[in-house]
Regions:
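Conserved ABC ATPase signature
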Residues: 37-41
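H-loop/switch region of ABC-family ATPase nucleotide-binding domains
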Residues: 104-105
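Catalytic Walker B motif of ABC-type/P-loop ATPase nucleotide-binding domains
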Residues: 64, 69-73
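ABC ATPase nucleotide-binding domains
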Residues: 137, 141-163
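Helical segment within the ABC ATPase nucleotide-binding domain
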Residues: 83-96
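Conserved ABC ATPase "signature" region
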Residues: 18-33
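A short, surface-exposed alpha-helical micro-motif characterized by mixed small hydrophobic
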Residues: 110-112
C-alpha cells in the first residue's frame, strides 16, 4: 500500500517540491504520517493529505501559472484547528492571486469568508452574488423550507434556525 509521502510526490514533479511540502505538512500536521499507508489514515487525515496535494499543486512557487483552485467540501472531516489551518492556507493563496472556488454546506463560514456565492438547489444555481446579499434568512428559509434568522455575535453575522 502506498505511503502518504509517495502519494504527495505523485502530484509534484519539481525538485523544489520537498520544500513546498514541508510547510504544508507542518501546517496540516502531517509530518508524522508520511510513512503510513494511505489505507491506515482516518477520514480527517486522508482529507488533510488530499488538501496538501491540492495546495502543493497550486503553490505559486512551484506553479506560477496556477490561478484557480477548486475544492469540494474542504472542511469535511476536519477538527476546528485543522479547519482554521485550511482557512489560513486558502487566505494565503487568495493573497497570492489564486482564485479559490469551494463548495460548502457551512453557511456561517461561507457568509463570513466568501467574496461571492452561488447558492444551489438540486444541482442548479438559484442565486448568485455577494455572500451577504445571497445568504439571507428569507432566501434560506424559502430554499430549505425551515425558518432561519440572522443574529450578530461579536460583530459577525450568524445564521441560525429559528426554534
Amino acid at each position: 500500500f502506498m505511503p502518504v509521502y509517495h502519494y504527495l510526490r505523485l502530484h509534484l514533479s519539481d525538485a523544489r517540491a520537498d520544500g513546498a511540502l514541508s510547510g504544508l505538512l507542518e501546517t496540516l500536521r502531517l509530518q508524522d504520517k508520511l510513512a503510513r499507508p494511505l489505507t491506515q489514515l482516518s477520514c480527517g487525515e486522508w482529507q488533510r493529505v488530499r488538501l496538501a496535494a491540492a495546495f502543493a499543486q497550486i503553490d505559486p512557487a512551484l506553479n506560477p501559472q496556477g490561478r484557480v483552485l477548486l475544492l469540494d467540501e474542504p472542511m469535511t472531516g476536519l477538527d476546528v484547528a485543522q479547519q482554521n489551518a485550511v482557512h489560513n492556507l486558502i487566505v494565503g493563496l487568495r493573497r497570492a492571486g489564486v482564485c479559490v472556488i469551494a463548495s460548502s454546506h457551512d453557511l456561517n463560514h461561507t457568509l463570513r469568508h466568501a467574496d461571492s456565492v452561488w447558492l444551489m438547489a438540486q444541482g442548479r444555481v438559484v442565486a448568485q452574488g455577494a455572500a451577504a446579499s445571497i445568504l439571507t434568512p428569507e432566501r434560506l428559509s424559502d430554499l430549505y423550507a425551515i425558518p432561519f434568522r440572522q443574529l450578530e455575535l461579536d460583530g459577525q453575522p450568524l445564521l441560525t434556525i429559528q426554534p
